[in-house]
C-alpha cells in the first residue's frame, strides 16, 4: 500500500481519545493553524502579468495594488533553479513521511500548514508590511505572539534545512513547507515561487494583533479576511484547511481535531460543520463539540461560517463538491503565500511533484 493510500484512512476514535490531555512533546505539534489566522494583504503586481498560469486572483486583490509603500522584490539565489527547490521539497516531504504517526496520527500536516499561514498572515495592505517575504517570525514580538504559540515546533522541524542550505530564506522555507504539507496528504497542487529574502531590520517585524481571535463572530471574520482582499467565498475556502491537524490546549486553550481524518486533505470540515453541534462544557475557551460523538471540535469562528448566510452558501457548496474546493483552495492558498511579494517575470510559478508521483 502506498503512503498516499495509507493517509486516506480515518483515524479510529479510540486513538483520538488517547491524544486528549496528553502533555508531551508530540502533542504540542498541533493543527491550530487557521483558528488564529490572518492579518491583511495585497498581491504582487507581477502576479497579474502571469495569468497564463491559471492562478488568477480575485478582482478584490487587483484593487489593492496601488498605494503600497515598501516593495519586496523576490530574487532567486545565484546558481539556483527550480530543480534545487524540487530537491528541497523532496527532503521536507521525506521527513514529514517519516513522522507520519507523530501527534497521535496527525503527523506534521496541520503544523506546517499553520506555519505557512501565520508567516503570510501578518500582511497589512495599507503599508505593505508583514507577510512571508522577510521571515520575521524568528524575531520578537512576532515569535512570542500568543497566536503563534506552538509554531516554534514547526520552525524547529524545518530548521535543519535552513542550516544545511545557507542560500535558503525563512520565508521560502516556511511557505514551501506548507505546500509540502497540503500536497503530501492528498491535497491539491499548489503553485509556488521562490525568492523571498530574509530581513534583519527588526523595525520591520509586524506588531502583535494582526493574527485574529478565534472567539469572534462572522463580522469579525469578514473584517480580517477583507483586510487581505479576500471575499466571502475565498474566506470560507481557506478556512476549510481546518480539515488538517488539531488544537492543543497547552498552545491555544482549545483542544481536539475537527474530524477523524486530520492527516488527510478533504472537504470533511464543511460536511461536518453542517451537522449538529453544542457548546462544550470544560475549563478551556468556548468551543463546540459534535452531538453525535462528542469527539470533534469547532471554533466560534468556524461556527460563524454556518450562522452567516453570506458564508453558509459556500459552506454548502464545498460540502457538496470536493473537486471545486480543491480547485479554489489551490488558487487561494497560493495567493496567500505571495501576499506582499513582488515577483519579476523571470520567476514563474511551479507545481512540485509529490513523492508518490516520483515513485511511479
Curated annotation (Swiss-Prot):
**What PANTHER family does the database record attribute to this sequence?**
CYTOCHROME C PEROXIDASE, MITOCHONDRIAL, THYLAKOID LUMENAL 29 KDA PROTEIN, CHLOROPLASTIC-RELATED
What does the annotation say about its assembly with partners? Forms a one-to-one complex with cytochrome c.
Q: Which Pfam families match?
A: peroxidase (PF00141)
CDD domains the UniProt entry points to: ascorbate_peroxidase
Q: Where is this site: Transition state stabilizer?
A: 114
Q: Where does heme b bind?
A: 242
Q: Does the keyword DNA repair apply?
A: no
Q: Name one GO cellular component term.
A: mitochondrial intermembrane space
Question: Is the keyword Magnesium assigned to this protein?
Answer: no
Q: Which GO terms describe its biological process?
A: cellular response to oxidative stress; hydrogen peroxide catabolic process; response to reactive oxygen species
Provide the family line: Belongs to the peroxidase family. Cytochrome c peroxidase subfamily.
Q: Which gene encodes it?
A: CCP1
Q: Which SUPFAM superfamilies match?
A: Heme-dependent peroxidases
> Which cofactors does the annotated protein need, by name?
heme b
EC?
1.11.1.5
Task: Extract the GO molecular function terms from the UniProt entry.
Answer: cytochrome-c peroxidase activity; heme binding; metal ion binding
Tree of life domain: Eukaryota
Under which name does UniProt file this protein?
Cytochrome c peroxidase, mitochondrial
Chain's role: Destroys radicals which are normally produced within the cells and which are toxic to biological systems.
InterPro entries to which the protein is assigned, alphabetical: Ccp1-like, Haem_peroxidase, Haem_peroxidase_sf, Peroxidase_I
Q: Which UniProt keywords apply?
A: Heme, Iron, Metal-binding, Mitochondrion, Oxidoreductase, Peroxidase, Transit peptide
Entry's cofactor comment: Binds 1 heme b (iron(II)-protoporphyrin IX) group per subunit.
| Annotated catalysed reactions | 2 Fe(II)-[cytochrome c] + H2O2 + 2 H(+) = 2 Fe(III)-[cytochrome c] + 2 H2O
Where is the protein found, in the record's own terms?
Mitochondrion matrix; Mitochondrion intermembrane space
Amino acid at each position: 500500500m502506498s503512503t498516499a493510500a495509507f493517509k486516506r484512512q480515518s483515524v479510529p476514535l479510540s486513538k483520538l481519545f488517547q491524544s486528549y490531555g496528553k502533555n508531551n512533546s508530540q502533542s504540542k505539534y498541533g493543527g491550530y493553524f487557521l483558528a488564529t489566522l490572518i492579518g491583511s494583504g495585497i498581491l504582487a503586481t507581477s502576479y497579474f502579468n502571469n495569468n497564463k498560469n491559471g492562478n488568477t486572483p480575485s478582482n478584490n486583490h487587483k484593487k489593492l495594488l496601488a498605494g503600497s509603500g515598501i516593495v519586496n522584490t523576490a530574487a532567486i539565489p545565484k546558481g539556483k533553479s527550480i530543480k534545487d527547490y524540487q530537491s528541497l521539497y523532496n527532503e521536507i516531504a521525506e521527513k514529514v513521511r517519516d513522522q507520519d504517526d507523530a501527534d497521535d496520527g496527525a503527523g506534521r500536516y496541520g503544523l506546517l500548514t499553520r506555519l505557512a499561514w501565520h508567516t503570510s498572515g501578518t500582511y497589512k495592505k495599507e503599508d505593505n508590511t508583514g507577510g512571508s517575504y522577510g521571515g520575521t517570525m524568528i524575531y520578537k514580538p512576532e515569535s512570542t505572539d500568543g497566536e503563534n504559540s506552538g509554531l516554534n515546533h514547526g520552525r524547529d522541524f524545518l530548521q535543519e534545512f535552513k542550516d544545511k542550505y545557507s542560500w535558503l530564506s525563512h520565508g521560502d522555507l516556511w511557505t514551501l513547507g506548507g505546500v509540502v504539507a497540503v500536497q503530501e496528504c492528498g491535497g491539491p497542487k499548489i503553485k509556488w515561487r521562490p525568492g523571498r529574502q530574509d530581513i534583519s531590520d527588526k523595525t520591520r517585524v509586524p506588531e502583535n494583533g494582526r493574527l485574529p481571535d478565534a472567539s469572534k463572530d462572522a463580522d469579525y471574520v469578514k473584517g480580517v479576511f477583507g483586510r487581505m482582499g479576500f471575499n466571502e467565498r475565498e474566506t470560507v475556502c481557506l478556512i476549510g484547511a481546518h480539515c488538517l491537524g488539531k488544537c492543543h490546549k497547552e498552545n491555544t486553550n482549545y483542544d481536539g481535531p475537527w474530524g477523524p481524518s486530520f492527516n488527510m486533505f478533504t472537504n470533511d470540515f464543511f460536511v461536518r460543520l453542517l451537522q449538529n453541534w453544542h457548546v462544550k462544557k470544560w475549563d478551556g475557551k468556548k468551543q463546540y463539540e459534535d452531538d453525535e460523538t462528542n469527539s470533534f471540535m469547532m471554533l466560534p469562528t468556524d461556527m460563524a461560517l454556518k450562522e452567516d448566510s453570506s458564508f453558509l452558501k459556500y459552506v454548502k457548496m464545498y460540502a457538496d463538491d470536493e473537486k471545486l474546493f480543491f480547485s479554489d483552495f489551490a488558487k487561494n492558498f497560493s495567493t496567500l503565500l505571495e501576499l506582499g511579494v513582488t515577483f519579476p517575470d523571470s520567476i514563474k510559478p511551479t507545481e512540485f511533484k509529490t513523492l508518490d508521483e516520483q515513485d511511479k
